[in-house]
């Protein structure tokens, strides 16, 4: 009965999100594998040279642009973070993070799932040049994790899928905070003041409920530039922009107009082909239906396929390729061990222990329909840290510490793969055990 209620509570938006993210996870994995294959083939020199190719335009002696790698990591990933920000705002206002009762359990789980891996890594790499990489195993890749959980189908309770999604959203928010606090260097306050001015203008537009997305996006570009110049990673600008996008919907008059158009269409005669009148009515219905959506919903709907099927796979292809040969030093500090143990051990232990203790102390309550064994399984899948972990590794290790960056990427791939396989097998076995008991 409780499971049925949970399933009914899962909105259509959330179901569509699961489907798109799960497919995106599979596509992401294929691109990561392809990157490793190309980086270790006869094409490896061309592969690595490609990402350092400058792309932009020249004005006299002045070049405006970036390398392809920077375009992907700083510009395209800003759109990915904009999508993340929109998802977080939606969940905070209307979803599983909209009340303390709903949010407390997954948020506490996310905190435990970030602290434990970070501590494991830091303990192993303390007082070394690689200690700054503690943020790498703290992240969860929602696309990969959902890709695995959706392959298990009905063997996994719907309530567990909701929990994992909410945990991953809270984890993304935590990762954004970590990036802003620990991976910011050489702050330039003049540019920060410029960014603050842009944010104030965005806040005024939000207050006025400006429904056109164009002013927000144009100001978002300016905000990105100011934040990029300030020393804070530019993707933070995308998250701030997301929180400034209005979520209010228009008055009920639009609903009435939509109903009248629906009645008009129903009254028209139907044939093998649509008449000109029917086509015009359907076009009007489409326009009115779009107008009923909030700017946040419209932007999220637009960005979802771009993020899932283009930006993240391209990021994976550009960043996952590591040439594994005799020149790579896998023993650089304890990066390999720190990342793998952080993802495979720290994530499940952190999530399980902090939620177990918080429930015993009556701080929060476990969602109905989920056992502690399920929580442990979700913790294992949360150890799939691919996209955000790769992103943080690029911030943590500069070109001067290239060996550590390459080892971290190998560790992320291995740790994520181990977590995904063990998590999937564990949840599969858990379902089989439950079926035998029945």
Curated annotation (Swiss-Prot):
A Pfam family per the record: Na_H_antiport_1
Organism superkingdom: Bacteria
Record-level GO cellular component terms: plasma membrane
Gene Ontology BP terms: regulation of pH
Residues spanning the membrane: 23-43, 62-82, 104-124, 133-153, 162-182, 185-205, 221-241, 302-322, 337-357, 372-392, 410-430
Membrane-protein topology: Multi-pass membrane protein
Coiled coil: none
Location (main, coarse): membrane
Keywords, in A-Z order: Antiport, Cell inner membrane, Cell membrane, Ion transport, Membrane, Sodium, Sodium transport, Transmembrane, Transmembrane helix, Transport
Annotated InterPro entries: Na/H_antiporter_dom_sf, NhaA
Annotated catalysed reactions: Na(+)(in) + 2 H(+)(out) = Na(+)(out) + 2 H(+)(in)
GO molecular function (one): sodium:proton antiporter activity
Keyword Cytoplasm appears in the UniProt entry: no
Subcellular compartments: Cell inner membrane
Function recorded in the entry: Na(+)/H(+) antiporter that extrudes sodium in exchange for external protons.
Annotated NCBIfam families: NhaA, PRK14856.1
Entry similarity comment: Belongs to the NhaA Na(+)/H(+) (TC 2.A.33) antiporter family.
Name listed for the protein in its UniProt record: Na(+)/H(+) antiporter NhaA
Organism: Helicobacter pylori (strain ATCC 700392 / 26695) (Campylobacter pylori)
Source organism phylogeny: Bacteria, Pseudomonadati, Campylobacterota, Epsilonproteobacteria, Campylobacterales
Gene from which the chain derives: nhaA
């Amino acid at each position: 009965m409780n499971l049925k209620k949970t399933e009914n509570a899962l909105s259509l938006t959330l179901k569509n999100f699961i489907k798109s993210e799960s497919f995106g996870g599979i596509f992401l994995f294929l691109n990561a594998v392809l990157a490793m294959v190309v980086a270790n083939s006869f094409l490896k020199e061309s592969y690595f040279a490609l990402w350092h190719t400058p792309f932009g335009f020249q004005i006299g002696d002045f070049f405006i642009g970036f390398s392809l790698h920077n375009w992907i990591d700083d510009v395209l990933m800003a759109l990915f973070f904009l999508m993340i920000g929109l998802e977080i705002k939606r969940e905070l206002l209307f979803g599983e993070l909209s009340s303390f009762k709903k949010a407390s359990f997954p948020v506490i789980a996310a905190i435990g799932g970030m602290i434990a891996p970070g501590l494991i890594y830091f303990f192993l790499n303390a007082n070394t040049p690689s200690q700054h990489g503690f943020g790498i195993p703290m992240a969860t890749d929602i696309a990969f994790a959902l890709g695995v959980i959706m392959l298990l189908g009905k063997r996994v309770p719907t309530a567990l899928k909701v929990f994992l999604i909410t945990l991953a959203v809270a984890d993304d928010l935590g990762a954004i905070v970590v990036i802003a606090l620990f991976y910011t260097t050489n702050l330039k306050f003049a540019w920060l003041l410029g960014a603050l001015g842009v944010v104030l203008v965005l806040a005024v537009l939000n207050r006025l409920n400006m429904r056109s997305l164009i002013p927000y996006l144009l100001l978002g570009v300016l905000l990105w530039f100011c934040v990029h110049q300030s020393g804070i990673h530019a993707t933070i600008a995308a998250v701030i922009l997301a929180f400034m996008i209005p979520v209010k919907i228009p008055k009920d008059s639009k609903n009435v107009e939509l109903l009248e158009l629906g009645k008009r269409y129903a009254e028209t005669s139907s044939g093998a082909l649509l008449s000109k009148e029917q086509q015009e009515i359907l076009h009007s219905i489409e326009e009115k239906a779009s107008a009923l959506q909030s700017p946040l919903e419209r932007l999220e709907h637009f960005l979802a396929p771009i993020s899932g099927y283009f930006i993240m796979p391209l990021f994976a292809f550009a960043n996952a390729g590591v040439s594994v040969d005799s020149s790579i030093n896998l023993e650089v500090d304890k990066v390999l061990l720190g990342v793998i143990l952080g993802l495979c051990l720290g994530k499940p232990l952190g999530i399980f222990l902090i939620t177990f203790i918080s429930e015993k102390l009556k701080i929060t309550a476990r969602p109905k329909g989920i056992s502690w064994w399920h929580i442990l399984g979700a913790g294992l899948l949360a150890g799939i840290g691919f996209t955000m972990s790769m992103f943080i590794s690029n911030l943590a290790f500069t070109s001067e510490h290239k060996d550590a960056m390459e080892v971290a990427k190998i560790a992320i791939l291995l740790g994520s793969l181990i977590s995904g396989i063990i998590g999937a097998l564990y949840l599969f076995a858990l379902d089989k055990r439950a079926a035998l008991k029945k």
